């Protein structure tokens, strides 16, 4: 029974990731006035499965001078962490109802840095190492703003449990009252997942392919799956935090559909941003965070601390 539950949890996520790669190629294709994949299956719908078969049947190559154990562990760790983050998400029911769900997600997203660092260092390639160091610096930096934004949301929500956010947003979505935080959160998730215009870790013009330059076949596919699973989970988090997942507590199927549609819309905006904007320079990326986002998020956090005290009202869960 445990194995069946595990498969029912993992397989839909992997299918969603597979079709996200297809949607990305289609969206980018139409934005550049071309078709995108349209040969394998009707309208190219079987393209992700063809890619998976190709990648997992190829021989996984390994550089002669690489550190073998870390080189193998890094992609497995990346995919495991990307799949584990889904556990506490209420959609509208979570797999495990954690009291500290938000801290759990923050901790796991911090751990994903290790897989990137290990892969870059174990490859014994200068391009991979520079890409990994960039990714680590970028991820750790933007996690600061993400943590402060989460703290601000928790001050409004009154609990670290994700499920209570559904109750908090029954009458009004939090994006209405906290739109500056929502805006900074969305841009920070772009940087956190190493997406354009913050894809400095995979700067093709400078670093060939970034931290995964020495990976091929199965291990490369694992990194790829982890990256896209993180994109979907970050957009799911945005939906839960700011866009209220429930329409009516009695119609759970409708709530799930609403949650899926909002997450899909946010994910397509991710792809739209990739098609529209050029890559940031590294100093601009850091300047945006430390000089712009951090002071504003701290100010917003202080505002949300002082408001309930000033108006003598308390969050719903205390």
From Swiss-Prot:
Q: Which GO terms describe its biological process?
A: mitochondrial electron transport, NADH to ubiquinone; mitochondrial respiratory chain complex I assembly
Presence of keyword Mitochondrion: yes
Cellular component annotations (GO), alphabetically ordered: mitochondrial inner membrane
For this UniProt record, give its keywords in alphabetical order, as a comma-separated list.
Electron transport, Membrane, Mitochondrion, Mitochondrion inner membrane, NAD, Respiratory chain, Translocase, Transmembrane, Transmembrane helix, Transport, Ubiquinone
NAD listed as a keyword: yes
Query: Which reactions does this protein catalyse?
Result: a ubiquinone + NADH + 5 H(+)(in) = a ubiquinol + NAD(+) + 4 H(+)(out)
Q: Name one GO molecular function term.
A: NADH dehydrogenase (ubiquinone) activity
Record localization? Mitochondrion inner membrane
Its transmembrane ranges are 3-23, 68-88, 102-122, 146-166, 172-192, 223-243, 253-273, 294-314
Family assignment from sequence similarity = Belongs to the complex I subunit 1 family.
Complex formation: Core subunit of respiratory chain NADH dehydrogenase (Complex I) which is composed of 45 different subunits.
Q: In its UniProt entry, what is this protein called? A: NADH-ubiquinone oxidoreductase chain 1
Q: Which organism is it from?
A: Perameles gunnii (Eastern barred bandicoot)
The gene it comes from is: MT-ND1
